């Protein structure tokens, strides 16, 4: 399987993304010599990884933007027949300890969401995985209002983490950004701050964008 060379510049990345629009996942997988999973229950990240590979993303699982040299994060987003997002969008792992001095401006969430290339993909379960088509890509930068909402949610969530209240945070917290358990395996544990300021063990958490927020982004472009 040939590794795709990363795009040299933003126009090249956008050209590659636009060339995928209307193409099925099976067609792209065949070009790369990959087999298509029957369903995504055990291969939840397969679609995203396939798109990353086809576009030449560089980050892998590293905590940086997928196209660091272009300042662009790549996000595939499963949509229904009306163009609405079907699930929340994972942003990054949330820090639960050693957070002194961490601000919104130097946070990984802020870094990852500076500029995002959204790639919509048909996601309704009745469509076989290989037959799902890729949609028109959207290059998005948060406007001042969106940035304010993101920062506000992030700061409120991080304040509760700092106070040792991570267990009290539910997916309902936050207007556009939420905190949820990250690990597929509930036995996975990481250190977090306890209410008395000591460290305790808890399940890893991740930051996710709510569907109401990503629907707003898609609506701005597709109406």
UniProtKB/Swiss-Prot annotation:
Disulfide bonds listed in the record: none
Keywords of the record: Cytoplasm, DNA damage, DNA repair, Endonuclease, Hydrolase, Nuclease
Keyword Cytoplasm: yes
Any Pfam family: MutH
GO terms of biological process kind: DNA modification; mismatch repair
Single GO cellular component term: cytoplasm
GO molecular function, one term: endonuclease activity
Places the protein is found: Cytoplasm
General function of this protein: Sequence-specific endonuclease that cleaves unmethylated GATC sequences. It is involved in DNA mismatch repair.
HAMAP family, per the entry: MutH (MF_00759)
Family: Belongs to the MutH family.
Protein name: DNA mismatch repair protein MutH
Native species: Shewanella baltica (strain OS155 / ATCC BAA-1091)
